[in-house]
Amino acid sequence: MSSSGTLSNYYVDSLIGHEGDEVFAARFGPPGPGTQGRPAGVADGPAAATAEFASCSFAPKSSVFSASWSAVAAQPPAAATMSGLYHPYVSPPPLAAAEPGRYVRSWMEPLPGFPGGAGGGGGSGGGGGGGPGPVPSPGGPANGRHYGIKPETGAAPAPAAASTSSSSSTSSSSSSKRTECSAARESQGSGGPEFPCNSFLRDKAAAATGNGPGVGIGTGPGAVGSSEPSACSDHPSPGCSLKEEEKQPPQPPQQQLDPNNPAANWIHARSTRKKRCPYTKYQTLELEKEFLFNMYLTRDRRYEVARILNLTERQVKIWFQNRRMKMKKMSKEKCPKGD
């Protein structure tokens, strides 16, 4: 029993191994000031176990470990040993140090014009909020965006817009082809003239007072009168038509509606019902002939009549319905119930 117990203890001890402490210390924690690798003479090592149980009749399995086990135990500090296997993380160099003719941008970096990445900056290489904001370049869009979004008219320009950066200029120049349409659209929207709806009304009021911007360069009234027709002829606008209407004498109103007379208001009220579709004499005559021939039209005949008279089938059907009701009413009037 004692020999089997020692065999099982040695076999389990050799399978478990004690290199886990060094590996985990190198991976997950920095080495301490006095920490060193395990020396070759540690009592719990497999070499010591072999020396202790040398009188055992069972030979140890030497194929489990390589011949360099003793050399691995006597090592310098674990951090220096594992540096060849696990390379430490080195932060990438900032984008400003890259080649001037090359555009480098990480896929994790937010867009310069994106609201969440404002202030991240391609020049600083940081995540966001640490470096300066995006700086527009002459070739890029005005607000540094790389996608076509209508800019806000009320937003003030950023204070960092006056500074210049090599990284932002390279990024703007490389993406100028993609943002050509959007930049042109934004420049037109921001710098183009705006024409409000009531601009011609203001011009009209200024021309009436004689002190507005619409007055010509001349100071006398003759100069004003001579400059207005030429301006209207060159640039026609609704204001010109209003001025022409003012020059014409006012016409008296055709009829004054009495607000206290509901009959007059009802006569001149605008009808909400659908307008009637009067038929021409030729269409009415042909429909009457067809009605005298047959009071009820088949579908094929109704289609033919509608095609000949340039009407719709619905119009022909409704006309025949009304004509039958009219004939029924006339027959009732000719034959009273008393007879």
From Swiss-Prot:
Organism placement in taxonomy: Eukaryota, Metazoa, Chordata, Craniata, Vertebrata
* Positions with biased composition (Low complexity): 155-176
Q: Which family does it belong to?
A: Belongs to the Abd-B homeobox family.
CDD domains for the chain: homeodomain
Could you identify this protein by its name? Homeobox protein Hox-D9
Could you tell me which residues belong to the region Disordered?
A: 114-198, 211-263
**One Pfam family cited in the UniProt record for this chain:** Hox9_act
Domain of life, per the record? Answer: Eukaryota
- Record GO cellular component, one term: nucleolus
